C-alpha cells in the first residue's frame, strides 16, 4: 500500500524520515502524528525510531541506509549516534563518514544490493558505502542531475526516477539496478522524488499532495500489491510523452 503523509505543513516527508526493510527513522520535535502514523503501520515489522542528526530534524537528507547498515554525517553527535545504534537491530551497522557532501540522503540512492552515488563523492566514502551497506556502488547522474538521492528512489522491487529521464536512460538504469523503473513524479508533479517518497519492499509513504494517479504508479512500480509493474511503466511513459508533445 501507499499512504499519504505530511510533516507539519511539508509534503517532503523524505527530508524528515528514512525507511528501510529493517528500520524507520522519524524526526523528533514534529507533531506526534508524524511519528504515530509510521508506528501504526510499521511497528509490528520493524522498529520506528525518533531521532535527530546534527541537532536538526533532517534525518532523511543527512543519512542513507538499508537493511545492512546506516551511514551518518560526522556532524551527528555522539549522543545521537548512540541513541540510534541502541534502537536498531544488532545486525545493522551504524557508522559516521567524513564526506564533504554531508547531505548523504541527497547524494546516495540505494536498496539492499546496489547504490547510485554522486559522481564527485570521495573514494573513501564510496568504499565505506560498499562495505557498511553491503552494496555494489555506481557513480551516476539521473536526467543530468548529480543529486541521485533526490531525483530517484528504488527498493529491491522497483523504482522511480526523474520525469525527464529518457526512455533509454530509464532502461539502462533498470538494467544496472536489476529492478523495473519508471520516470515519474510525486506530490502533484514534483520531480524531487527522494524528498517526497519513503518506500521499502512492502509499503510506501508519500506527501499529502500526491495524486491518485501518482499513487497508482507508485503501488504498481514498487509492486506493493504484488502487481506486475510493466503496465504502469507503459502507462506513465505514454502520459509523459503526451505531456511533452
Curated annotation (Swiss-Prot):
SMART domains the UniProt entry points to: eIF6 (SM00654)
Protein name: Eukaryotic translation initiation factor 6
Homology family: Belongs to the eIF-6 family.
Pfam families in alphabetical order: eIF-6
Matching NCBIfam families: eIF-6
Function: Binds to the 60S ribosomal subunit and prevents its association with the 40S ribosomal subunit to form the 80S initiation complex in the cytoplasm. May also be involved in ribosome biogenesis.
Highest taxon in the source lineage: Eukaryota
Keywords: Cytoplasm, Initiation factor, Nucleus, Protein biosynthesis, Ribosome biogenesis
Keyword Nucleus: yes
Gene Ontology BP term (one): ribosomal large subunit biogenesis
Compartments in which it is found: Cytoplasm; Nucleus, Nucleolus
Species in which this protein is naturally found: Ostreococcus lucimarinus (strain CCE9901)
InterPro entries in the cross-refs: eIF6 (IPR002769)
